[in-house]
């Protein structure tokens, strides 16, 4: 593997580019299904045996990770069903309505879309780490080992993101109730995407030292394709990020703007840089090293 490019580029920028690129890949194959729970439904269904995985088992995993209640879990399952990626079955294998006792099984559409997303992810990983021909030349398949490795990487990164959020929120001095509420929101994809937009546009993310803050309208415009959130919803989330210590409010030509706080910017940068070894470990697991020699 030629690492000249990645050695010249800061570790945090390599990781951030891969993470943001991955979410674009996901949105390409699973448009509109960008919530964390959607992601877990798809991974669980793709890895499940032919008879499927129980909705109750999926809920236990989501509750442990995000505190997701069973009603929300079932709503996310229905979203995936409505788009044709999963089918909901009873114990006898017959179609049924989603419930805690139902089973979730992958459709042919999910197998096709998921595996193409997986192969494109491996190509993006190789490119991020300087192996520009890796994913294409090695003819890699999306088997269970590959899926498990990808899932493990993102679970590990999510833990680092959670620790980063806890650091920033704790420094803000919120009451336990407000801090818990903040954490419930910050672990969602919507908040991560908005924060990463600000990080990428800041000096922390490699922009020039005098990079200006972003006005709310610009955040709304950039986030529409990824989040499909309206102006008021973006404004609400930005307001929360100000209250929780991630953003500092500014004014640019009489327009409200925000920039990352120094603490948040530094914490995110450190977390991303610490993820670089995990990204390389993922590459080792996914790409046969004899093929890269």
Feature map (PLM): residue ranges:
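Short alpha-helical segments that sit at the start of domains
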Residues: 15-42, 165-200, 205
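Short acidic, hydrophobic short linear motifs in intrinsically disordered regions
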Residues: 50-64, 205-222
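Short amphipathic alpha-helical interaction segments
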Residues: 67-82, 228-243
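A short, conserved structural fragment
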Residues: 81-92, 242-252
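Short, cationic-aromatic polyanion-contact patches
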Residues: 91-117, 252-275
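Exposed, interaction-prone assembly regions rather than primary DNA-binding/catalytic cores
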Residues: 127-193, 197, 289-293
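Electrostatic interaction modules used in gene-expression and signaling proteins
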Residues: 193, 197-198, 204-212, 250-252, ...
